[in-house]
């Protein structure tokens, strides 16, 4: 398997460059032998199919660390789904880089999120998570200044005149584009642990029209 990955279809040009220019593809686990075992444990076939599809599309992809969540998954990797028909089914999205109080999961609708005190979707899809990683890398490179704030200061951010960045498919985490700046707001840990002090935002200022282009 080549170490240089081919970006999955459906990503923006920026995200494709990020995946292929900064990512690695390591050998991924074959989930086929797990199917019978998982079926015996009562995992629905459709949920197994979701995990297998994720593994085929994303499994083995190692990307640079995220600016939050202590870097995100080390390698994207599916594992046994867990849950119920009542609460919905989720499966792991890959192991943490460091010891964390939460894991990374794929939700019932394909959302990428964290399994903290309660399930908290960060982005509507894994594509959204990857787009956010790519945008953080891009903004961090081109910004004149980067300001990081936490807690109550995040709630005081004035986003008037900013537009949401659609490709990140933000849920708990969102990106906002202004006339010369980008703002990333990370609410996942604050929501997942009911801890407002965990709110954080990164403000990238001094971006020209090219750096702000979609």
Question: Predicted segments — roles?
Answer:
Residues 197-203:
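Short, conserved beta-strand/beta-arch hydrophobic-aromatic motifs that form part
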Residues 1-119, 134-189, 204-213:
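A surface-exposed partner-binding patch
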